[in-house]
Amino acid sequence: MVMQEIERGNVAENPSDDEVREYAHALADQIEQSGFEPDYVIGISRGGWRPAIDICLLMKWKPFVTIDVKKAEYGRIVGENPHINRASIKGQSFLLVEDMFETGLTAKGAKRFLESLGAKDVKTACYFARDFAEVKPDFVLRDGVTHEVFFPWERFRK
């Protein structure tokens, strides 16, 4: 009954910590099966931090860094994290991680930023992507989501 309501968009989904761990395992498996081996796993602040850390741990300790993408009126402003410098970006491959692609524009802005600095390959991953997302992730567990999803780390936000 609840899944039918979720599929119709009538109920918000609140995955538990255990479910989120299962998502991380499934997404890490999907990425590994594709053959993509990033040099860095990047969590896009804030929703991507926890999924990126979990995936990073599951993918044999790939270096984890964060990137801050702020929404601006005319696009995305990307801030660099002090632990990743421009010199270490050139020629490297990156996995950008979000919890959910609403529009996908945040990840698109971060990807463009890394590519402009010479990144060799940049792929995106998320647990869920909304049905109206303008940009589709390279790796996703559930695409075309029509309902709200509140992850455990969002429950503490005001």
Where are these regions (language model features)?
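PRPP-associated nucleotide enzymes
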Residues: M1-K158
